[in-house]
């Protein structure tokens, strides 16, 4: 089990990618999904901004997942899936693990909490065990919306991801390596030395 921390662009990395989604798996760039969000960048970088192609592939994988329609959500998609739903899209020589960890409100604001993030990570690791073939996993810091809650720092989702990965890897291997990528614009919000120290305590 190897863990790496990098600052940079998620989509420049090699390996399977983890992409955080809301429970509606919205993909429409604009008012529904920001072009600067991870979902927006994923659509542009990995699907050449072909929303129909991405939606078709997502729908095919989600058709057997439990869902319910929400008539109050009139913009974007209105079919909701359980928090923690994970599907694996197939790319060229790698997969994209799409994990629903937040709830998209009718006001188009995505919210989550610690319990939902933790549960979603559990499901994510299980899916990667089955379909990841023990290859390197590259993921962003999902759950950064938790940092908007007063009293909660940006490092909380980072620590949760690292803790969850290590605990679950000890139960059963997930991948040969997990690389956590921090966006350049978020670099000032974290202390990389503190993260390394936290990792050391987890390995002890």
List each language-model region with its residue ranges:
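Macrodomain-like recognition of ADP-ribose-binding/processing modules
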Residues: 1-204
């Amino acid at each position: 089990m190897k863990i790496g921390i990098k600052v940079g662009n998620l989509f420049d990395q090699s390996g399977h990618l983890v992409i955080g989604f809301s429970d509606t798996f919205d993909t429409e760039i604009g008012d529904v999904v920001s072009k600067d969000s991870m979902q927006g960048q994923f659509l542009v970088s990995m699907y050449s901004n072909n929303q129909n192609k991405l939606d078709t592939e997502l729908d095919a994988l989600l058709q057997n997942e439990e869902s319910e329609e929400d008539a109050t959500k009139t913009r974007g998609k209105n079919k909701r899936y359980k928090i923690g739903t994970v599907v694996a899209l197939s790319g060229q020589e790698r997969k994209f693990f799409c994990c629903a960890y937040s709830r998209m409100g009718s006001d188009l604001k995505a919210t989550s909490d610690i319990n939902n993030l933790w549960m979603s990570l559990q499901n994510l690791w299980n899916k990667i065990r089955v379909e990841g073939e023990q290859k390197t996993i590259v993921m962003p810091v999902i759950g950064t919306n938790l940092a908007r809650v007063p009293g909660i720092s940006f490092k909380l989702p980072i620590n949760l991801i690292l803790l969850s990965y290590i605990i679950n890897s000890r139960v059963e291997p997930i991948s040969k390596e997990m690389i956590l990528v921090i966006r350049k614009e978020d670099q000032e919000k974290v202390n990389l030395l503190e993260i390394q120290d936290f990792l050391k305590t987890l390995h002890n």
